Structures are given as C-alpha cells and as structure tokens.
C-alpha cells in the first residue's frame, strides 16, 4: 500500500503547514548547521571527494499492484570522483538489475556546470540538457558544501515552518540556490541536516516532496559527512546510497572531466525552465531513460501515426505507444504514455485524422506510470477511463491529486471524471466495428487488459509482449498465448505498447501455441 499512501500524502501536504518559528533567524540556524558539520573552515577545506558506495533503487510506479509495494530495481556499485570546488563529478555505475529485466548495466556519467556526457561500452555521447540539469541539481542536494552556499548567500535564505518527523520538530530553512528552492530540515538537538527537500512534479502523484534523508554522520578529515543517503518521494524510498569509503581531497587527473573530442559538438548546457526532474531521475534508476531533450522521442525524431487499418492508427516513435481506433461516431484510445506532452499530441493528431469524432474512451492496459502518466489529459477532455480491476479507486485518486507545481489540463479545467473497471470482459460495439477487452492473468501487473479490435483482427498488448526484434518465449508472452487460446484469437496482428507489430502466426513458439490461419 506504499504508493497509495504516497498519493494520500500528496493530498494532505497543503493541509499540514504551520507558521514558521521566529525564535532563531534562518542565518543563525544555518550557522549552527555548518558548525555541526565541522565548521566553515573544515567544509571550505573540502575541495574534492572520492567515494565508493553501494546503492539500491525502487520504483513505486512499477509496483505489481496499483498503489502497492514499490518494485525493487536492483543493486548498484558506485565510484564517484567529485570536484566540489568546481561543481563537477564523474560517477561510474555498475548495476545488477533485477527489473524491468535481469541485466548488467555499466556506464559512467560525467557532469560539469556547462555540459555532461555518458560513456558505456559503445563509447561516449553528450547528455541531454535535461539530464545535465537533473544531475547538477542532485549533486548540489547531496553536496556537503550546500550549507556553505546558504551561509554565504546574501539573500534567498528564509525561515520556514517546523516539521514533525519521527517524533521530532525539525527546524526548517528555505534556501533559493539559483533556480532551485531547497528546504533544509535540521535536527533540533544536533543541528545536523536531516532532510534536503525539493518540491517536484510527478507524472502520477503530481505535487510531491522529493527528499534526501541524511544519516550515519562520520568524520571525513575535519568535516562530517552523512554516509547513508535515502531518496524518498512523499516518504516512499526510491533510492538508498551507502558510502563505504570516502577520501577527502584526492588527487584528480587534469583530464578527469574533459569531454571527448568526438562529442564536443553535441554538448548541451543544463536545461532551464520546466525540467521533468522526477522523470529523468527515476527513469535513470529504472535503467530506461531516453537521453533526449525530446523526452519521449530520440533526438531529431518524433511521434508518428502508422496505419494498421483505415480506422486503426498505431502511435509509434516514442518510448511507449498508443493505439487509436475509430468507431462510427467516436474514438477509443489505448494507453496514455509519459504525460501531457504525448497525450496532447495524440489528441491533436486524432482530430486531424478523424475530424468530428471525439475521444470517448481511454483504455489503460495497466497502472504503470510509463503508460498512464498522460491519463489526466484525457480526463480533462471528458473521456471515460477504462481500467482493469482492481484499479478503479487508484485512478479516481489520481484524478484528485493536486498539480500546482506544473499545472496540467485537468488542474486548469476541473471536471467530473468517470472511471470504469473491467473485471473479466467488456466490449464496445457499433455498426462499424467491435472492440473486446479482456482482463488477463499475467506476471507483470495485477490487472492487465488485452484489447482486440475484431474486424481488423488487431490485438493491443503492452509490456508482456513487445514486438521489437526477435520475440523470446517468457512468462509474459505465454500469458498472451493463453489469452489467445481462451478467447479463440487466431491470425491476428499484434500491436505493441512498445516497439511495432508482429504477426501472431510468426511467433507461435513465443506464445506457446500452434497458430493456424484465421
């Protein structure tokens, strides 16, 4: 129930504020926090760090059940070379991934105030500007010298309300660091920072607290540095980093952060404005970040309609797809990937392709955030949202979540929202076509809709079978095959929530069935 509690926490945030305590000024509190970390001289003496660390990551938006326990993603070894004085870092990631697939991922991310690049077994490439911005912000959040910046700031430091956490009334200071508003929560006894917070937009939860929770303070030189760093979204842990070795002021090679000549022409400065921080950070955690400022499509490309039949359009070109089906007098859309960016594109293109036909239904195959982040856009346009049982209450709550940090269409034009559940089967039928929806047993999520457009014999499947390259037999593809057997589907074209299409007749072994022509 952790993600459900996360959503509920978001609803209560606005109601939980207190008036700031004025007993001490913000600068007095910062002075005390700096002293607790060893003092200004000790912190100024930290010019660089070498860190060996172990990390674990989780994703609440990929839980097995909607609102359930966050999915464990895997273990990571980290080697960090960090030039604190110049705001540069090189981080080597060695990842033993457990989800979304069992694999080993190795790469090095190098970031400076002006650019970033990523190196893996294929070579180096420039990082997107949104990745550079997110990485720089997170380095700043975790930096042991963040308090020094607040201490030296001439403005932008202000007292905030105390906040109760684990039985303590934590002292609070706001610090405007460039374009980032940090909330610093301090232990009332030790004066050490407990939480470094930003307010972020999440594509499902909306207005959110993104917290770095610090503990296990140890001496590094004359300073103190937290050795356990827990990253939490509205109190739900999404990352935990444990420092195993920390060396103060190591020798750093002169070219440690230099960008390779081959990628200099593509170097991008950090993005400004509305950076989708949570999407960038957590897609990197998931091992599925598309390093593109297009967010949903690779550089230089975009979404496109691929016609599977005159009344069936496959939205391809992004990290995840939609399907548009034209009925006699309305449209049905399957899935709502990423967020408003993709949903708005789908709305606009659907209207051009099928003028005069409103989108009446949005069918969500399952609850995972990468396929449902754009749901609220369809809600704002009046579409009825169809979800697999038992997800109705979850999506009704999603509709109520505040989105004021990055206001979306539903926040701007509030309206009643209708969510309907498919327990076993449901169908839409008119004079032109029929769509059958089946809530199928599968290993990926509790509640998964398979959609069958009957006349054209197109089947929509998301995640448990993805037509991109050879399709190997696994628990997901076998679940699709079992559904085909149960409902008598043969000779179909399978359209994927990822990838493109596949012919059922061509992938019989993966489906665990002998396929005959229809």
Each predicted region: which residue ranges?
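Bacterial N-terminal signal peptides
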Residues: 4-15
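Flexible, processing/modification-adjacent segments and terminal tails
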Residues: 24-29, 35, 42, 102-103, ...
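N-terminal mature ectodomain segment of secretory-pathway/periplasmic proteins
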Residues: 28, 32-35, 40-124, 161
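Gly/Pro-enriched, hydrophobic low-complexity segments
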Residues: 166-262, 452-454, 461-462, 467-485
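Zn-dependent metallo-beta-lactamase
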Residues: 247-250, 256-328, 426
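Conserved beta-strand hairpin/beta-sheet module of binuclear metal-dependent hydrolase folds
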Residues: 306-350, 448-466
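Active-site metal-binding motif and surrounding structural segment of the metallo-beta-lactamase
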Residues: 341-386, 421, 482-493
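Divalent-metal (often Zn2+) His-rich catalytic cores of metallo-beta-lactamase-fold enzymes
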Residues: 481-518
């Amino acid at each position: 129930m952790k993600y459900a509690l996360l959503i509920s926490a978001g609803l209560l945030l606005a109601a939980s504020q207190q008036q700031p305590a004025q007993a001490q000024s913000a600068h007095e509190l910062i002075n005390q926090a700096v002293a607790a970390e060893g003092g200004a001289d000790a912190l100024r003496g930290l010019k660089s760090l070498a860190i060996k660390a172990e990390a674990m990551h989780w994703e609440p938006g990929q839980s097995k059940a909607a609102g359930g326990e966050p999915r464990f993603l895997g273990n990571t070894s980290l080697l960090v070379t960090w030039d604190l004085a110049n705001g540069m870092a090189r981080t080597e990631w060695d990842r033993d991934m457990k989800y979304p697939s069992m694999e080993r991922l190795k790469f090095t991310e190098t970031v400076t105030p002006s650019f970033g690049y990523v190196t893996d077994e294929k070579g180096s490439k420039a990082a997107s500007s949104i990745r550079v911005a997110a990485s720089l912000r997170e380095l700043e959040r975790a930096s042991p010298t963040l308090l020094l910046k607040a201490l030296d700031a001439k403005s932008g430091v202000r007292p905030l309300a105390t906040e109760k956490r684990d039985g303590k009334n934590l002292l609070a200071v706001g610090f405007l660091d460039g374009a980032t508003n940090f909330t610093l929560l301090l232990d009332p006894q030790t004066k050490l920072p407990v939480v470094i917070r930003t307010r972020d937009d999440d594509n499902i939860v909306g207005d959110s607290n993104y917290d770095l929770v610090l503990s296990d303070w140890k001496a590094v030189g004359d300073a103190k540095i937290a050795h356990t760093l827990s990253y939490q979204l509205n109190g739900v842990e999404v990352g935990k980093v444990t420092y195993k070795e920390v060396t103060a002021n190591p020798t750093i090679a002169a070219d440690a952060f230099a960008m390779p000549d081959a990628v200099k022409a593509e170097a991008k400065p950090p993005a400004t404005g509305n950076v989708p921080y949570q999407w960038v950070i957590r897609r990197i955690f998931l091992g599925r970040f598309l390093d593109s400022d297009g967010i949903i499509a690779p550089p230089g490309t975009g979404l496109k309609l691929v016609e599977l039949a005159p009344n069936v359009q496959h939205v391809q070109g992004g990290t995840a797809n939609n399907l548009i089906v034209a009925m006699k007098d309305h449209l049905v859309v399957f899935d709502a990937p990423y967020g408003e960016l993709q949903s708005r594109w789908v709305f606009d293109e659907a209207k051009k392709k099928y003028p005069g036909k409103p989108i009446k239904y949005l069918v969500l195959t399952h609850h995972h955030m990468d396929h449902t982040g754009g749901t609220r856009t369809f809600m704002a346009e009046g579409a009825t949202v169809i979800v697999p049982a038992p997800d109705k209450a979850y999506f009704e709550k999603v509709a109520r979540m505040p989105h004021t940090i990055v206001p979306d269409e539903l926040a701007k034009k509030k309206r009643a929202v209708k969510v309907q559940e498919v327990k076993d089967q449901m169908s839409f039928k008119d004079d032109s076509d029929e769509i059958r929806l089946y809530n199928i047993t599968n290993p990926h999520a509790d509640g998964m809709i398979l959609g069958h457009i009957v006349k054209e014999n197109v089947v929509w499947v998301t995640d448990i079978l993805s037509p991109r390259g050879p399709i190997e037999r696994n628990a997901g593809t076998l679940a699709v095959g079992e559904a085909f057997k149960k409902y008598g589907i043969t000779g179909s074209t399978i359209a994927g929530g990822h990838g493109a299409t596949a012919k059922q007749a061509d992938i019989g072994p993966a489906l665990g069935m002998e396929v005959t022509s229809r």
